[in-house]
Amino acid sequence: MKGIAIFLVFIFYWTTSTLSSFWQFQRMVKHVTGRSAFFSYYGYGCYCGLGGKGLPVDATDRCCWAHDCCYHKLKEYGCQPILNAYQFTIVNGTVTCGCTVASSCPCGQKACECDKQSVYCFKENLATYEKAFKQLFPTRPQCGRDKLQC
């Protein structure tokens, strides 16, 4: 069953545009932190990855909660932050956001800003990253049922 879930998640993201925010976020995490977004952050704590509930377990998990909140605000404006394309560059460790297509601006630009804040947060908290909080198949029973309000 878990294998099927992973396969379906993979297929969904594989079929998403290669310029989507999802793929750009993966690249940004790798460039800024030196870590894989999937292998280091997906399933970390109570908020990293799909969904989220309970209280963040540490500073890294709070980065994910803040990222979820940022995306939630964009959805209220009618954006689709996981799908809105954007471009970014990194010069001397500084991420600069831009848009790829006029139709995805300003949503793509705003999604990039959410992602940028998240990866900077991850970088600031690398020293306190706790491998014990990372689960490949997150069920998150320790997180409770309620979602922390933004």
UniProtKB/Swiss-Prot annotation:
The active site is at residues 67, 115. The gene is Pla2g2c. Testis specific. GO terms for molecular function: calcium ion binding; phospholipase A2 activity. Keywords: Calcium, Disulfide bond, Glycoprotein, Hydrolase, Lipid degradation, Lipid metabolism, Metal-binding, Secreted, Signal. Ca(2+) binds at residues 47, 49, 51, 68. It comes from Mus musculus (Mouse). Pfam families: Phospholip_A2_1 (PF00068). One of its GO terms (biological process) is arachidonate secretion. The lineage of its organism: Eukaryota, Metazoa, Chordata, Craniata, Vertebrata. PA2 catalyzes the calcium-dependent hydrolysis of the 2-acyl groups in 3-sn-phosphoglycerides. Testis PA2 may be important in the production of prostaglandins, by the release of arachidonic acid, which in turn are necessary for the contractions of the seminiferous tubules and the testicular capsule; they also seem to decrease sperm transit time through the male reproductive tract. This is Group IIC secretory phospholipase A2. It is found in: Secreted. Belongs to the phospholipase A2 family. Disulfide bonds join 46-143, 48-64, 63-121, 69-150, 70-114, 79-107, 97-112, 99-105. Residues 1-20 form the signal peptide. Its cofactor is Ca(2+). It comes from the Eukaryota.
